């Protein structure tokens, strides 16, 4: 099974890729470190391959790196998508999440950097987020290796049983002055 690691720049995709595969791909605290896709087998799950894609904010692309990600997601049709979301900035990440959900592919949301949220005295209501989105939401810390096995199990389950996200229109006509979009 093949899973695409998709998310905004600097959300921890390559750190998660390294944690999943045992690789040592270069990680940087600035956008544009990953400029092409990389793939590797998941440790302890040799039937599972993950593809680390460059950061992308939307399926409407502007940069060459974003085109690489969009084209892989749309044309290669991986068995599932692991959407990595920076838990310290969820709102910024949700635009891409909702676009990915609309594709109707098996998907799991990896809520990364939960250790930073906790260190700053914050919390995330994961169960409520999961109920609202209709997909598994797994809190992780890729840099510490926390929640990684649970994430893999959820991703495999979603792909094996073809759990596709429910299609939601998160905007009502009231949100747009009565206009339908």
Protein language model features and the residues they cover:
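Conserved G1/Walker A P-loop phosphate-binding module
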Residues: 1-64, 74-76, 80
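Active-site-adjacent beta-strand anchor residues
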Residues: 6, 83, 141
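Alpha-helical scaffold segments in soluble metabolic enzymes
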Residues: 15, 19, 68, 150, ...
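Conserved nucleotide-binding/hydrolysis micro-motifs of P-loop NTPases
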Residues: 23, 32, 55-56, 87-91, ...
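Helical mechanochemical/support elements of P-loop NTPase systems and associated helical scaffolds
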Residues: 31-35, 49, 61, 65-68, ...
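Conserved C-terminal guanine-recognition region of P-loop GTPase G domains, centered on the G4
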Residues: 40-48, 68-138
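Canonical P-loop GTPase G-domain recognition
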Residues: 115-169
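Long, well-ordered amphipathic alpha-helical subdomains in the mid-to-C-terminal portions
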Residues: 167-181
């Amino acid at each position: 099974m093949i899973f695409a690691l998709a998310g905004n720049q600097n959300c921890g995709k390559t750190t998660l890729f390294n944690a999943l595969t045992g690789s040592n791909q270069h990680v940087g605290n600035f956008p544009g470190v990953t400029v092409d896709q990389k793939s590797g087998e998941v440790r302890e799950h040799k039937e599972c391959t993950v593809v680390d894609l460059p950061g992308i904010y939307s399926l409407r692309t502007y940069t060459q790196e974003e085109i690489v990600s969009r084209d892989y997601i749309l044309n290669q049709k991986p068995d599932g998508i692991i959407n990595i979301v920076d838990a310290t900035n969820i709102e910024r990440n949700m635009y891409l999440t909702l676009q990915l959900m609309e594709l109707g592919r098996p998907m799991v949301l990896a809520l990364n950097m939960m250790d930073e949220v906790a260190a700053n005295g914050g919390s995330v209501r994961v169960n409520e987020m999961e109920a609202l989105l209709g997909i598994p939401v797994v809190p992780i810390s890729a840099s510490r290796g926390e929640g990684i096995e649970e994430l893999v199990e959820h991703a495999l389950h979603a792909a094996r049983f073809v759990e596709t996200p429910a299609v939601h229109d998160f905007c009502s006509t009231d949100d747009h002055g009565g206009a339908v979009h």
